[in-house]
Amino acid sequence: MDQQAQPQFQIQKVYVKDLSFSIPNSDKIWTTNWKPELHTDLKVEATKLPEENTYETVLTLEVKVENDGMVAFEAEVKQAGIFTVANMQEAQIEHAKKAFCPNILYHYAREAISDLVISGGFPQLCLSAVNFDAMYQDSLKESADSKQH
C-alpha cells in the first residue's frame, strides 16, 4: 500500500473562536453559602473548508452554575480546530469530525472554562470527561430513528 492510500489525520490549528463569562448576580452571590449546582451543554459543528480534505470543527461548551436559587456565573467557549482528514471512507470522516476532533478540543475548552472561573473569583471548576464516541453514536441513532418515522 502506498503512502497516499494510508488514512491521514493532522491537526492544523487549535484556537478559541469565541469566549464569554458573566456574573449576573455579582451584587448578591458573594454573600451566600457556596453550594453550587452545575449545568453544562455541549454542541459540535463541523464545516468543510475550501482546502482539500480540510475541516473546521467547533466545540461549544456552555456552563451555568447556580447557587442558592440564583445564577452564580455563566461561561461559554467555542473551541475550534482545523483538521486534515484524508484517505478515509465518508463514515470514518464523519466520525473524525464529530467525535475524534471534539475529543481533542474538549481538553482545551475545559481549561479555558476553568481559567475563566478562577479569574472570576470562584473555586476551580473541574469538568468531567465526555464520551464523544457515545454522543456521536446516539446522534446517528436519533437520525436513523427520525428517518423511519
Swiss-Prot record:
<comment type="function">
    <text>One of the proteins required for the normal export of preproteins out of the cell cytoplasm. It is a molecular chaperone that binds to a subset of precursor proteins, maintaining them in a translocation-competent state. It also specifically binds to its receptor SecA.</text>
</comment>
<dbReference type="GO" id="GO:0051082">
    <property type="term" value="F:unfolded protein binding"/>
</dbReference>
<dbReference type="GO" id="GO:0015031">
    <property type="term" value="P:protein transport"/>
</dbReference>
<keyword id="KW-0653">Protein transport</keyword>
<comment type="subunit">
    <text>Homotetramer, a dimer of dimers. One homotetramer interacts with 1 SecA dimer.</text>
</comment>
<dbReference type="Pfam" id="PF02556">
    <property type="entry name" value="SecB"/>
</dbReference>
<dbReference type="InterPro" id="IPR035958">
    <property type="entry name" value="SecB-like_sf"/>
</dbReference>
<keyword id="KW-0963">Cytoplasm</keyword>
<comment type="similarity">
    <text>Belongs to the SecB family.</text>
</comment>
<dbReference type="GO" id="GO:0005737">
    <property type="term" value="C:cytoplasm"/>
</dbReference>
<protein>
    <recommendedName>
        <fullName>Protein-export protein SecB 1</fullName>
    </recommendedName>
</protein>
<dbReference type="GO" id="GO:0006457">
    <property type="term" value="P:protein folding"/>
</dbReference>
<keyword id="KW-0813">Transport</keyword>
<dbReference type="InterPro" id="IPR003708">
    <property type="entry name" value="SecB"/>
</dbReference>
<keyword id="KW-0143">Chaperone</keyword>
<dbReference type="GO" id="GO:0051262">
    <property type="term" value="P:protein tetramerization"/>
</dbReference>
<keyword id="KW-0811">Translocation</keyword>
